[in-house]
């Protein structure tokens, strides 16, 4: 590999930092109901599985922007990032309060987020949030 090719590839640490920043941006966009940011960060084939149901990208963004799903707060702890080529897995322990169609959901969750690099751009492709004691 030439020096020019090496310079073009971000280091593992740079990639992990980028994904942490994207994760922060995604959480902020949820709280703000920022449709444009959610659409930019989430892949077309995104899927979210959480305690009440599962949603694809279109339904999830619609729920957030319509107010059917209100994210009052999410605090991430123990955020870990592992990069495997063009796939990355982020894990965290979240303290969160959501209101879904009038039903308040508050607690601690173990969250797994999967990112994929497509056409030199990282996107969020899947999230699973599981309640923990």
Which sequence ranges carry the predicted segments?
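A beta-strand edge to alpha-helix "cap/lid" segment located at domain peripheries
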Residues: 2-133
């Amino acid at each position: 590999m030439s020096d020019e090719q090496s310079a073009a590839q971000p280091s593992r640490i740079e990639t992990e930092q980028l994904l942490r920043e994207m994760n922060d941006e995604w959480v902020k966009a949820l709280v703000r109901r920022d449709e444009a940011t959610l659409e930019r960060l989430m892949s077309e084939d995104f899927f979210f599985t959480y305690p009440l149901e599962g949603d694809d990208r279109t339904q999830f963004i619609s729920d957030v922007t319509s107010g059917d799903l209100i994210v009052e707060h999410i605090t991430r702890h123990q955020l870990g990032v592992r990069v495997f080529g063009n796939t990355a897995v982020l894990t965290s322990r979240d303290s969160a309060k959501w209101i879904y169609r009038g039903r308040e959901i508050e607690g601690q969750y173990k969250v797994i987020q999967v990112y994929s690099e497509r056409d030199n751009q990282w996107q969020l492709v899947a999230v699973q949030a599981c309640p923990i004691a």
